[in-house]
Amino acid sequence: MPKKNEAPASFETALSELEQIVTRLESGDLPLEEALNEFERGVQLARQGQAKLQQAEQRVQILLSDNEDASPEPFTPDNE
């Protein structure tokens, strides 16, 4: 597991760590100070994940703007 202030290697790693933190917090077995530390790390991971998603969305927009014939459409999983 990465150090507490270290950014995870990937979006998927951050998401996995965030899920583990949520599980530990939901168990209710953590002492208050440890729960606060875990919550703080979770907020940090969530923000990093959101930033990575925004960067990916910007890259997609740039790629689509290079091809003027293609227009961005909202993703709907039902179209698979």
Swiss-Prot record:
UniProt entry tagged with the keyword DNA-binding: no
InterPro entries: Exonuc_VII_S, Exonuc_VII_ssu_sf
Record's subcellular location: Cytoplasm
GO molecular-function term, one example from the UniProt record: exodeoxyribonuclease VII activity
Keyword field contains Nuclease: yes
Entry keywords, A to Z: Cytoplasm, Exonuclease, Hydrolase, Nuclease
SUPFAM superfamilies: XseB-like
Catalytic reactions on record: Exonucleolytic cleavage in either 5'- to 3'- or 3'- to 5'-direction to yield nucleoside 5'-phosphates
EC annotation from Swiss-Prot or TrEMBL: 3.1.11.6
GO BP of this protein: DNA catabolic process
GO cellular component, as recorded: cytosol; exodeoxyribonuclease VII complex
Family in the record: Belongs to the XseB family.
Oligomer status and interactors: Heterooligomer composed of large and small subunits.
PANTHER family in UniProt: EXODEOXYRIBONUCLEASE 7 SMALL SUBUNIT
Function of the molecule: Bidirectionally degrades single-stranded DNA into large acid-insoluble oligonucleotides, which are then degraded further into small acid-soluble oligonucleotides.
Protein name, UniProt field: Exodeoxyribonuclease 7 small subunit
